[in-house]
Swiss-Prot record:
It holds the Pfam family Ribosomal_S6. The lineage of its organism: Bacteria, Pseudomonadati, Campylobacterota, Epsilonproteobacteria, Campylobacterales. InterPro entries: Ribosomal_bS6 (IPR000529), Ribosomal_bS6_sf (IPR035980), Ribosomal_S6_plastid/chlpt (IPR020814), Transl_elong_EF1B/ribsomal_bS6 (IPR014717). HAMAP family: Ribosomal_bS6. This is Small ribosomal subunit protein bS6. Keywords: Ribonucleoprotein, Ribosomal protein, RNA-binding, rRNA-binding. Belongs to the bacterial ribosomal protein bS6 family. Gene3D superfamilies: 3.30.70.60. The gene is rpsF. One of its GO terms (biological process) is translation. The keyword Nucleotide-binding does not apply. One of its GO terms (molecular function) is small ribosomal subunit rRNA binding.
Amino acid sequence: MKHYEVLFILKPTLTEEEVNAKLEFVKEVLTKNSAEIETVVPMGTRKLAYKIKKYERGTYFVIYFKAPTNLIAELERVLRITEEVIRFLIVKYENKKEIAAWEKLSHGIKQSKKEIKPLDAPEIQ
């Protein structure tokens, strides 16, 4: 299994229940397709660098996971057709140095905080 990271941004107009439902939906897509989720990092609502689909803010999530390569096409398809996702990025960690960084990121985040809370980023004017 390969090491991956997916970052996705949800619309800021969603309620907390809808955000949690979309996060669970993405996690379900991963687990149903034999992925092992290492860490989920909710990064909170942040101002975007530029408008995306008329939105200036978005709710960010990062998921570190291990998965077979055939899962990525399905994950991309699901994220593209999900209206609430305004942008996403999937990163594959390939060489030993990158995998070591992935391990450090996924386990370091997990061990440093028992429950990860969203970051309150100050709004930039």
